[in-house]
Amino acid sequence: MTYEPDTADVAEELLHNLRGRLGTDSVDYAEPPERIHGGFDNFIYAFSLSAAPLRFSGRLILRLYRPDTDPRQACFESAIQNVLAGAGYPSPPVLLVGRSGDGLGLPFVVMPMVPGRLMLDTMWGPTAIRMAVTLAKTQIDLHAIDPEPVRRALARAGCPSHVLAVERDLWEMEREIERAGLVGLRPGARWLGDNRPPPVEDTVVCHGDFHPLNVLVDEGRVSGVIDWSARRVRLGDPAYDVGATAAILAHGPVDVPDLLAGPINLGRRCFVALYRRAYLRDRPLDRDRIRYYEALRSLVFLVEAGAARQAAAGVIPPIFKRTAFGDERTVRGVVQRFHAITGETPRIPDAGRGA
């Protein structure tokens, strides 16, 4: 099941909201909202205004959250992005926050458009080597930021501390396995529960979804890190962030013919190795902890794919958010990697058939 808002309706309601919030009816569109690529958890529109205050000059982005998104996400994103931007990190500041009752029917944020291109679009040939190092360095810079101002800002935004714990992934995954009847994933979840690493004192800000689709590059330099999701941001072990990134880099969807799958996967493995080496060279971490968190995120992928198949089969209610990990080739790769780390072989329902 998918939900798609009407762009004309979004434009009308957004302008009405902006005029009310900015206190003037003279504000109008220089460029009306246009849907742009990206966003698994939200709908993204680019637009610009005329006769608006200076901070609303230039091209702007509207992120309109999907109906099943945590209603606190807009406030969460505003809090963390503004703190990080204030600390000098390339996170776009949020200019305006809207709740579901503010006219558009769904929570939203407005922020400046980040210049540049997605890092993924620049990763060809020798540039890929440089981008692997750049990705690692940008993540290291994030992990060097004092997490306490972030914790305080998120607490003011209504985000309790347990929501930011890295253990939350395991709790939510176990609950979703039972809700969706994914019995073939129970042994893997049990292994993760039995082999949790001990707590660390080195608490950092973890993006949780740090990969080349969430990093923008302008003239070879990082211009923005986006998509600070309440589902994924954590304050905890830096190995959590590195392991999650390794899993995403290895298994994120790439739509290529079967003939090219082998060479593409080889290139991905090389990129992951370069990224991991660059990170550990400048900020050493326990490799076993990284592998554990890579396995954790890998099982999260399988839970997401399995739940999508159960929903498609009518076993559980429809899911608004599409999965990026549901095709057979991706599932096979994730299962193989999880087995290599844990010795367990998780299983999800076949596509087109419920459990």
Residue positions per predicted region:
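Conserved active-site segments centered on acidic
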Residues: 222
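Active-site activation/catalytic loop segments of kinase-like enzymes and analogous catalytic loops
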Residues: 240-283, 297-315
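Helical subdomain adjoining the active site within ATP-dependent kinase catalytic cores
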Residues: 285-289, 300-355
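Catalytic-loop of the protein kinase fold
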Residues: 205-207, 212
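ATP-binding pocket architecture of kinase catalytic cores
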Residues: 32-165, 172-187, 196-202
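Juxta-kinase regulatory segment immediately upstream of eukaryotic protein kinase catalytic domains
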Residues: 1-29
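Activation of the activation-loop gatekeeper triad in protein kinase-fold domains
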Residues: 226-231
